[in-house]
Amino acid sequence: VLTIEKRGGAVMIGERREAILGMIIDYYINTGEPLGSKTLCSMLPYSISSATIRNEMALLTNMGFLEQRHTSGGRVPTKAAYRYYVDNIISSGALTEYEMMKLDEALSINASDPERLLASASELLSEVTGCAAFFSTLKDPYDCIQGIELIPAGNNKAMLVMLSLGGKIKSSVCNIACPIDDEFKSLFYKVTKEHFIGMPLSEIDLSFIQSTAPLFGAAIFDMLPILSTLCSLCQEAANGTLSISGETKLLSQSELGGSVYNLLALLAQKDKLEALLSQFARAKTGSVLMLGDENPVYELRNTAMAIQKFKYNNNQTATLGIIGSLRIDYKSILPRVDYIMKTVNQYLSEGGIRYE
């Protein structure tokens, strides 16, 4: 699951410089302020001269890990520094038993419904990280109808539920002009069992509905609202899904600056993000943490973006992840993201609802 891939070939900078770089990044993440040599000298757990600190900071600057935005100010980390920090300095933190219990409780509610599980996991990720979160499902041309349920709801209404082989559950209320008695339901289930169950979702369209009309005989006019609703549910399930949670949380991440508006526009339009996630879903990599310019999408090049891929129910593929500024609290956030991803993966591996 979200095991951060260590980037091979990175230049190791030595224990003392790692300690200095780590403290500068921690300070910047916590305060948003640059750190000067005098303050850093007082924070180190061992004695070292201010001149030595300045020399080490200058070397880290020359190596591309620090930058000085103002002549008289301290140093702040570069995008390359965050990558080195994640790969070589921080270690995976452990969640408390209480934290794990609360996350388990939140995810277990929708454990048997893959799409609702992914949606609740996305909302939970946004809540516990303070970032935007997302989930997506790929369009699967082989997904087909596994079950259909017609539930009378009174007042000439009925709830229609469609379950696909890939675990997608879609439902809608439709208006019926006649009572839904045993004869009505018997005819509906007979025709749908013989002609709809096992059909690819993408093939359930209006022309298919029209081709089945004679099978319903005189009842076709009463059946049409249900069949039209079923057609809509199948088309909805046949398409891929991209849902985003907590976009407005990005407005409070000051490190994004003016780029946040381009980022929000990207999330609203979805096209570029859908393309990126679709490309990732088809790649061999199971998880990735893209920092800064590692992201191929221009609007995401000031962000940290974690993505996890899931395979479930044979042909189904989904992604789940977060988007935040580069100044997120990696020590706190990554263990939570990792735990949620592992839990979701466990539930999906166990299999979703099956229609009997």
Each predicted region: which residue ranges?
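Short, Lys/Arg-enriched N-terminal segments with co-localized hydrophobic residues
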Residues: 1-11
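Charged, low-complexity terminal tails
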Residues: 8-9, 27, 41
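Alpha-helical hairpin
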Residues: 12-13, 48, 77, 95
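Residue-level marker of regulatory loop/turn positions in helix-turn-helix DNA-binding domains and
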Residues: 13, 32-33, 252
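Short, leucine-enriched amphipathic alpha-helices that occur as contiguous helical runs
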Residues: 13, 17-21
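Short amphipathic alpha-helical interface segments
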Residues: 20-31
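N-terminal helix-turn-helix
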Residues: 30, 35-89
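Intrinsically disordered, acidic Ser/Thr/Pro-rich low-complexity regulatory segments
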Residues: 90, 94-356
